[in-house]
Amino acid sequence: MRSLFFLFIVHLLALGSGKAVFKNGVSQRTFREIKEEIANYEDVAKAIINLAVYGKYQNRSYERLGLLVDTVGPRLSGSKNLEKAIQIMYQNLQQDGLENVHLEQVRIPHWERGEESAVMLEPRIHKMAILGLGSSIGTPPGGITAEVLVVASFDELQRRASEARGKIIVYNQPYTGYEKTVQYRVQGAVEAAKVGAVASLIQSVASFSIYSPHTGIQKYQDGVPKIPTACITVEDAEMMSRMASRGNKIVIHLEMGAKTYPDTDSFNTVAEITGSMYPEEVVLVSGHLDSWDVGQGALDDGGGAFISWEALSLVKDLGLRPKRTLRLVLWTAEEQGGIGASQYYELHKANISKYSLVMEADSGTFLPTGLQFTGSDKARAIMKEVMNLLQPLNVTKVFSNGEGTDINFWIQAGVPGASLRDDLYKYFFFHHSHGDTMTVMDPKQMNVAAAVWAVVAYVVADMDEMLPRS
């Protein structure tokens, strides 16, 4: 009875949390009035936090995630595993009591790595750990045997272009942060091919390594020959750099069975809590369901997808119904360049004026430190007030750069966007590697992440007005 009374009070607080004043259809509210409206959500926010972090549903997102990734495993674009996961999630969301659960068809790339190996033949025999990069071609039958040229940058490759023809280029670039260093993974094959190389091997884009290669997407360029490309461990890249500096001749035999097949059908997975007053207006909450084909895809991006599901579950379990529709989208084929999100945008952009906020969790679900946000100054000021509701968790900061692969389409068109900001210290230890498993995940940290995500999504969806764009 006490819990029912508490939920009744939560309902009253939600419904009576503010009243807009309009003149000629244009809001005349002061920021002070908006601030007071948001402050009235304090008890609702505490109810969400208590349920997610301390209450009946603590650890639920972790347990749900573990069941999926232990059952299905990794979920590469075009794979049977991904489609199995999508069907499981479709059933899960229906069983959870969410509304308008449906699948939206998407055409996605289908690439498979096949068998792959690399062996150093000179100056000594050494079997190397490699992971072919997404969309890479395979080697010819029997593989490639070639001498190695080690470079530390694209500039060095250009300076030594006369030495590169017929060689395997090994990039031993220093790690200077993911955003800067990832260019070698994405463009390494193209730049090597331009100077006549027969293959490229790139030091894994990782902040720490225990002899672990890390995969990811790479992109060919029209008019440039396609050559096989893979990532190698930090340890092997650095070793070959040392060997080269001593004047050693390095020879590698590389075999890659990678193949690209015709595009295939997949689906974005959608579920909602329909808005009570403005059902056509939307706060979108998202993560991607696909992963690479190594590890379990728990970190990237199982955690983000499942705290996004949990956000809607928590709102539903408290009996809350926001004024606007809360829409969950689990993207497909994010790792291939946001394919599912791109097609979703094309399908729904006619309603762009109805999107108040687009949210994406795709940077891990370690302990949150705040929210990254992109939007107008007025919208940022409002988001700072919303984040103040999370003082019980000490997660109140609003950072810049709310962009994410799957929501950038909307942000570039002027829709406010937010990404979860958390402690990334360990993220790139495991990112796109065999180490991306449930062992990396922490249920208590996921609880906090889910609470943050749910509070932000619900409050923005329930406020009297959409977030301002200018």
UniProtKB/Swiss-Prot annotation:
GO terms for cellular component: cytoplasm; endoplasmic reticulum; extracellular space; Golgi apparatus; lysosome. Glycans are attached at N59, N351, N394. It is an enzyme of class 3 (hydrolase). CDD domains: M28_Pgcp_like. Residues 1-18 form the signal peptide. The active site is at E334 (nucleophile). N-glycosylated. The secreted form is modified by hybrid or complex type oligosaccharide chains. One of its GO terms (biological process) is thyroid hormone generation. Transmembrane segments: none annotated. GO terms for molecular function: carboxypeptidase activity; metal ion binding; metallodipeptidase activity; protein homodimerization activity. Residues 19-42 form a propeptide. The keyword Zinc applies. It is found in: Endoplasmic reticulum; Golgi apparatus; Lysosome; Secreted. Its EC number is 3.4.17.-. Belongs to the peptidase M28 family. PANTHER family: CARBOXYPEPTIDASE Q, PROTEASE FAMILY M28 PLASMA GLUTAMATE CARBOXYPEPTIDASE-RELATED. Homodimer. The monomeric form is inactive while the homodimer is active. Carboxypeptidase that may play an important role in the hydrolysis of circulating peptides. Catalyzes the hydrolysis of dipeptides with unsubstituted terminals into amino acids. May play a role in the liberation of thyroxine hormone from its thyroglobulin (Tg) precursor. This is Carboxypeptidase Q. It comes from Mus musculus.
